[in-house]
């Protein structure tokens, strides 16, 4: 993905910064990008991301994929089941406009539970608050990529996920 790593961001487009940042530390293990291109084309043809029902279905599929990709216990990585993240978020009860930080966000499970907890967003002001409310840090490249994608699928235009180690001396 060298083209994505070297994406020109001189025009200030935040989405280009996101894509460039995501692929900065990611290695391409594919022998050919043809299958990836076919998958992207098929998704573009079949999934209407504006239709709420289709988007919800795609989000559910993506969440299921994330769960399956977790390497339970390997290298200290654990998938927190959605009922657990939902329960914890419910007990913390964050309000829209408060800053929520997950310093080891993995694929973004706690953050998406937080977004769902906020409920329906009705105004432009609420939408702008939502964009600033959920924040995360993730050290590893693949979970970082998945968290960014997960938040984009949950209507966060420019996810506030930083690719950094929360246990580094700078943050302790």
Model-identified regions with their sequence ranges:
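Conserved S-adenosyl-L-methionine
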Residues: 77-172
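Non-catalytic, mostly N-terminal accessory regions of nucleic-acid modification and defense proteins
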Residues: 1-96, 160-170
């Amino acid at each position: 993905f060298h083209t994505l790593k070297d994406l020109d961001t001189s025009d200030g487009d935040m989405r280009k910064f996101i894509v460039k940042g995501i692929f900065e530390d990611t290695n391409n293990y594919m022998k050919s990008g043809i299958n990836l291109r076919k998958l992207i084309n098929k998704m573009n043809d079949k999934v209407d991301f504006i239709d709420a029902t289709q988007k919800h279905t795609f989000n559910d599929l993506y969440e299921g994929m994330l769960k399956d990709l977790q390497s339970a216990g390997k290298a200290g990585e654990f998938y927190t089941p959605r009922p657990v993240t939902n329960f914890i978020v419910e007990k913390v009860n964050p309000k829209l406009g408060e800053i929520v930080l997950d310093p080891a966000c993995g694929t973004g499970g706690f953050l998406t539970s937080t977004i769902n907890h906020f409920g329906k967003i009705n105004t432009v002001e609420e939408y702008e608050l939502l964009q600033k409310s959920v924040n995360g840090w993730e050290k590893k490249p693949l979970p970082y990529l998945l968290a960014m994608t997960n938040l984009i699928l949950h209507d966060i235009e420019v996810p506030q996920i930083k690719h950094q180690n929360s246990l580094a001396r700078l943050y302790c």
